[in-house]
A protein has these predicted regions:
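Short, solvent-exposed loop/turn segments at the edges of secondary structure
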Residues: 5, 51, 66, 88-92, ...
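Mid-domain, small-residue-enriched loop/turn segments at the edges of structured enzyme/sensor domains
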Residues: 80-82, 113-154
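A penicillin-recognizing enzyme superfamily signal
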Residues: 1-2, 7-14, 22-24, 30-43, ...
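Short active-site loop at a secondary-structure junction
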Residues: 6-8, 32-54, 67-70, 91, ...
Length: 298
């Protein structure tokens, strides 16, 4: 009859059609019956660094940056601190993403402008972007209201899908009393090109390194191509992992309903463990498929 205070939520999308195939709104409460909060689409939380590929890096990859572009990881007055307190100087954009360098995300977002950067999540239906979000802190996921796991899964699935957005839904088909199909979301989906194809493929290439040598190192799936991003808020009240394979995209959030610091909460602790266990399970028996290469990939 225990009531769990530490909560979580997750959303999984089938990348072949953009449909939501699994959703978890929280930990089961035996003592509670009837309607309960579904945190996967009803709770808006700060996404931390998981927001960087959506609003900063993929947009900049459309504008001439590449994984090999050199950027300057040097602290500057008025700028953010890197999570580990260290600064690496001249580094590649790939390395900056793998190590989740806040300084680089902040600089590139200012260069891009918040108006341009935030136009991307808005195109993908992020419902709670407000006027007060149009500041550099948004580059690090510092948003007024936050995001849901459904929104984040849809955005990362868009990157996997060569930049083409499909509105997330759990409804695959609706038929009437006579069996006539009224809605068929498997075959007739409205699509929107949000990111340029090559930029999305470059982003996927970079995010593969996160699981090999970055903030989620050592957690790549066995015998399956995968890419992803960790996210942790500065006060450790929200932890995320957003990742995908050519088959599925899954996002996981962990935290308290009433935000509270959790000393050992990082994107690469509880959220990543949940993501890896779930993704390993649903990929059993599936053949490894490589991600598509970007133009100029070595």
């Amino acid at each position: 009859d225990k009531v769990y205070k530490l909560q979580g939520a997750a959303t999984c999308i089938d990348n072949s059609n953009g449909l939501i195939v699994a959703i978890v709104g929280g930990r089961k409460q035996k003592s509670i019956t009837g309607y309960t909060l579904n945190r996967a689409y009803q709770s808006y939380r700060q996404p931390g660094s998981c927001f960087k590929p959506i609003a900063v890096y993929t947009p900049q990859l459309e504008r001439g940056y590449t994984p090999d572009s050199i950027v300057d990881d040097t602290y500057f007055n008025g700028g953010p601190h890197n999570a580990d307190g260290s600064y690496a100087g001249k580094i590649s954009l790939r390395y900056a993403v793998e190590k989740s360098k806040n300084v680089i995300a902040w600089k590139l977002f200012q260069e891009l402008t918040p108006e341009v950067g935030l136009s991307y999540p808005i195109k993908m239906g992020f419902a709670n972007i407000t006027d007060s979000d149009y500041y550099p802190a948004a580059s690090l996921g510092g948003l007024t209201n936050g995001v849901t796991t459904v929104e984040m899964a849809s955005a990362f699935a868009t990157i996997e899908n060569d930049g083409v957005f499909r509105e997330p839904t759990c409804i695959s088909k609706i038929t009437d009393a006579d069996g006539k199909t009224i809605v068929n979301n498997k075959n007739n989906r409205r699509e929107k090109q949000v990111y340029k194809k090559n930029a999305a493929r470059m982003m996927t290439s970079i995010l593969q390194g996160v699981l090999v040598s970055g903030t989620a190192r050592g957690n790549a799936l066995d015998n399956m191509s995968c890419a992803g991003k960790t996210g942790t808020t500065s006060d450790k009240k929200d932890g995320w992992f957003c990742g995908y394979t050519p088959y599925y995209t899954t996002t996981v959030w962990v935290g308290y309903d009433n935000p509270k610091t959790i000393s050992d909460l990082y994107g690469n602790t509880y959220p990543l463990r949940i993501w890896r266990e779930f993704m390993s399970d649903i990929h059993q028996g599936l053949k490894n498929v490589e991600f598509k290469s970007y133009d100029g990939e070595k």
